[in-house]
């Protein structure tokens, strides 16, 4: 199969998959695997090659990004459980000030959601939003929209969250995550600007229950602080995120400048995503020790793996679909037509 028929078949397959997940409540993993198998047969991939295509697509994702996703999730869990994420949020509030609470919430969400899953980030930061709402009397809706926008922007664009890592692996740039981080941060800027103005716009037109029925929301924030006891210092709160980024930047710099010798080898070693995030995890473990929560590290790891497991399998199933699409010649067809259009 080739040409327009290939594109139409692909569109129909994606539509069926979306319906299967959203309407028929089929597990995303099974939906992706099933559609991949059916698509492989329909587009004419030789039957003898289909098992190998599925296997290579699945294992390729695990080999390129699986460990990176696990390490990033572990770092995020540690930041959440030690209060480091809360410390990061407080640092942002001090930087921005309380006169623009919606901007503070947006930046907080953007920073915290880099290592922490966006849903957990919302749980962590929502008490701060409520506390700022009580102090500033600013629109609760505007602050919530800004927070959500910040959380989702970095979650979608910036590693080590699974989505951008998976995209990097599919595009063959999984070993250059620093570039993905930089490009994701750049793309985030216009997104955050638009979201900021939209939050202000919608906040003037809609009132939430928080504003209609005021309650003692600041108490939740105080209780949250008490549950952590003393928050980590600023350096240790940011180190598990910042150190891996610096390591990956060093590795990219070594490649770009053509370094050679032992220094280049060492720079590229610590700059590889797996090693860089392992170093970040080591700083996270030190943070756990300082917080007196080292004994709970095993439980944290187990809980994190339970959360990450389904994400890994769904991501790997997406890799299978990508491999089927590539093997069917869809990518080559798009390249040929793009080249023809450019001429």
Where are each of the predicted segments found?
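Structural signature of hydrophobic alpha-helical transmembrane segments
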Residues: 1-10, 62-68, 120-121, 188, ...
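Long, contiguous bundles of hydrophobic transmembrane helices that form the permeation core
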Residues: 3-4, 182-300
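Alpha-helical transmembrane segments of multi-pass membrane proteins, especially transporters
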Residues: 6, 32-39, 65, 69, ...
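Hydrophobic mid-bilayer segments of alpha-helices in multi-pass membrane transport proteins
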Residues: 6-18, 25-45, 66-72, 236-249, ...
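Membrane-helix interface "capping/anchor" motifs
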Residues: 19-30, 134-142
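Membrane-embedded alpha-helical segments and adjacent helix-loop junctions characteristic
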Residues: 46-135, 291-343
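Alpha-helical transmembrane segments and, especially, the helix-loop junctions at the ends
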Residues: 73-75, 109-126, 138-204
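Membrane-helix interface motif
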Residues: 158-167, 250-260, 328
């Amino acid at each position: 199969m080739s040409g327009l028929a290939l594109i139409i078949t692909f569109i129909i397959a994606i539509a069926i998959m979306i319906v299967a997940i959203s309407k028929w409540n089929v597990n995303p993993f099974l939906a992706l695997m099933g559609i991949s198998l059916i698509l492989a047969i329909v587009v004419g991939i030789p039957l003898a090659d289909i098992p190998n295509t599925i296997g290579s697509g699945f294992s390729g994702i695990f080999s390129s990004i699986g460990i990176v996703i696990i390490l990033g999730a572990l770092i995020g869990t540690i930041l959440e459980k030690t209060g480091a994420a809360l410390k990061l949020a407080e640092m942002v509030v001090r930087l921005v000030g309380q006169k623009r609470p919606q901007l503070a919430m947006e930046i907080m969400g953007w920073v915290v959601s880099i290592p922490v899953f966006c849903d957990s980030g919302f749980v962590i930061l929502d008490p701060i939003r409520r506390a700022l709402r009580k102090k500033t009397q600013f629109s609760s809706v505007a602050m919530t929209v800004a927070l959500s926008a910040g959380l989702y922007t970095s979650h979608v664009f910036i590693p080590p969250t699974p989505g951008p890592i998976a995209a990097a692996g599919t595009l063959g740039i999984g070993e250059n995550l620093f570039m993905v981080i930089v490009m994701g941060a750049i793309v985030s800027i216009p997104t955050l600007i638009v979201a900021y103005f939209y939050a202000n716009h919608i906040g003037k037109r809609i009132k939430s229950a928080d504003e209609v029925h005021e309650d003692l929301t600041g108490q939740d924030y105080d209780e949250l602080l008490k549950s952590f006891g003393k928050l980590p210092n600023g350096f240790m709160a940011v180190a598990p995120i910042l150190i891996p980024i610096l390591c990956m930047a060093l590795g990219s710099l070594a490649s770009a400048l053509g370094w050679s010798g032992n220094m280049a080898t060492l720079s590229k070693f610590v700059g590889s995503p797996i090693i860089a995030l392992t170093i970040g995890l080591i700083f996270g473990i030190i943070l756990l020790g300082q917080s007196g929560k080292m004994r709970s590290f095993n439980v944290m790891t187990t809980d994190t793996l339970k959360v990450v497991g389904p994400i890994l399998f769904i991501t790997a199933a997406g890799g299978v679909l990508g491999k089927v699409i590539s093997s069917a010649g869809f990518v080559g067809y798009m390249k040929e037509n793009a080249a023809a259009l450019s001429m």
